[in-house]
Amino acid sequence: MLVCYSVLACESLWDLPCSIMGSPLGHFTWDKYLKETCSVPAPVHCFKQSYTPPSNEFKISMKLEAQDPRNTTSTCIATVVGLTGARLRLRLDGSDNKNDFWRLVDSSEIQPIGNCEKNGGMLQPPLGFRLNASSWPMFLLKTLNGAEMAPIKIFHKEPPSPSHNFFKMGMKLEAVDRKNPHFICPATIGEVRGAEVLVTFDGWRGAFDYWCRFDSRDIFPVGWCSLTGDNLQPPGTKVVIPKNPSPSSDVSTEKPSIHSTKTVLEHQPGQRGRKPGKKRGRTPKILIPHPTSTPSKSAEPLKFPKKRGPKPGSKRKPRTLLSPPPTSPTTSTPEPDTSTVPQDAATVPSSAMQAPTVCIYLNKSGSTGPHLDKKKIQQLPDHFGPARASVVLQQAVQACIDCAYHQKTVFSFLKQGHGGEVISAVFDREQHTLNLPAVNSITYVLRFLEKLCHNLRSDNLFGNQPFTQTHLSLTATEYNHNHDRYLPGETFVLGNSLARSLETHSDLMDSALKPANLVSTSQNLRTPGYRPLLPSCGLPLSTVSAVRRLCSKGVLKGKKERRDVESFWKLNHSPGSDRHLESRDPPRLSGRDPSSWTVEDVMQFVREADPQLGSHADLFRKHEIDGKALLLLRSDMMMKYMGLKLGPALKLSFHIDRLKQVFWKRETILWSREGLSREVWPISEDTALGHFFSGMDKVFGSLSKR
């Protein structure tokens, strides 16, 4: 037994006659490694990397503009907090140190200060901004005042992407460990599927390999780290790396080693060995006899009398020993496990910080549209989830593809995203894959599915509440009288039911005046993120019937006929006869214009709108939200900046929209395709009436020409 109490004593162990894959301990070289494994490095032209690595002239504390990795539509101010090789460790100003991320110096996601404004954009607070959102402009001024800006000359142009995927299975490369992005490790291409490649880390096992596109900036050619000065980790010793990687090869067994500090951790699943030279509290027993013997699969792994527990704050992921990897075709499967690495800002994945759970329900009795097979829809589960939002989105989208008559049609509606789950479709005798966008909120899932279903013309297919038989049997007319009992998003029914092309003149008039085809103002004027239910009728049913009767007698040419309809219109739109509005109006606060409300008025409105929301009224004082700000609020904004849960945010969004309907009566008329455009009028009833008859003249004029 050898026990040492100092780092120098531990370093003396390196002289023992032991090697890792043919390289002396702590001296990994690609040349010897490639010879011993009979492997081929991936050619340089396979990668989206510069042939000559760019120089890194950045300095600690420099400021620059960077894309928020958790909200890719936002450009934020970032500070350089670390440097390694050709990479920068960045921290978004206004965020904490738990969401640091790494970018190459030639990444297109980093730009010098002023680039966003130059291109007409605005700098945004990062997701999870710790201060009040209203204080962001002042925070931005203080942050940039006197700060050292990264000069334009040290930024590099991003290299072009390869023309197509040149990778082949078994090629060697260097890849970023996405669980610990400050590590770059030797890896192997485990599988090639369309534009995607499977990255497997050499010498490690588990289910932590990852798929990425062939033009990912997280993979590098062999020798990249030696050129840039970055630190390349040696291969692990969890599994023996075969000389001839084969998809059919069996899972290799462990090989005992006397690597300086990995010995005690080698047989503990879920832990990763340390780099040579790192301090530790206690040195384990060194097993010198039979250093190269390989136990059989049935043999029990070596056990030590005492095992170190995990460090405080570290998370251990349980794994089953010798379990076959689910996705990797080679024996070298997982991304290096990192339980023993300190959980600093760069090691905590942002996805672990906030993982919203969502459940999406399927409406099997709804319209599936022309692209989806109703029989296949019936075979799907009643709901997807509850699970992480990204997983549920992937399941729902994949279900639409699998149930399509032609998968290519549904696949064409989707755009390549970044950071999300992978979906696949089979057409043209090939399997095609695509990354969905990263999901950072539950509302994003609902909006995404709304747009997809609208393209598929299968509205009312998904919802975030179970579809009851009562709801499914409601007609458009019944819904217009009863929709105040439902909250927006409670049953996620898609709007924008556009009028279809009609063949006969009578059908054209019915389509232009049918209540179910008249779209409400809130639907056309809604801000992004508002999700209405079925559109409320813009005209009372009696008005529609009367106009239809007048139209059936002939075209309205004379003044008398016009006066008849005007009288009937005003009669049905007189005060107190707004049948198309809800029977229960929101609090009016003495009839004042909501845009003139003070913060106290807004708090009173919240309390009176729903007593259950009274506990949230103080948030409006804290964030200084007056009437004008109230009218601009959306449910996703209330969740993101005010910290509200989904339910209260949807309720408040519903009451705010009803408030707009009461104070600003905007009439929206959905016309057919006969050369008429759809307009929204924030105007009085008399003016709207004039527009109505002007539009009627256009319709009848078009019909008379035929």
Curated annotation (Swiss-Prot):
Q: What is its main location?
A: nucleus
Q: Which SMART domains match?
A: MBT, SAM
**Localization of this protein:** Nucleus
Q: What induces it?
A: By retinoic acid in F9 and F19 embryonal carcinoma cell lines.
Source organism of this protein record = Mus musculus (Mouse)
Family per record: Belongs to the SCM family.
* Name of the coding gene: Scmh1
What protein does this entry describe?
Polycomb protein SCMH1
Checking PANTHER family in the record gives:
POLYCOMB GROUP PROTEIN, POLYCOMB PROTEIN SCMH1
Lineage, broadest ranks = Eukaryota, Metazoa, Chordata, Craniata, Vertebrata
Please provide the Gene Ontology terms (biological process) for this protein: anterior/posterior pattern specification; chromatin remodeling; heterochromatin formation; negative regulation of DNA-templated transcription; spermatogenesis
Keyword Repeat: yes or no? yes
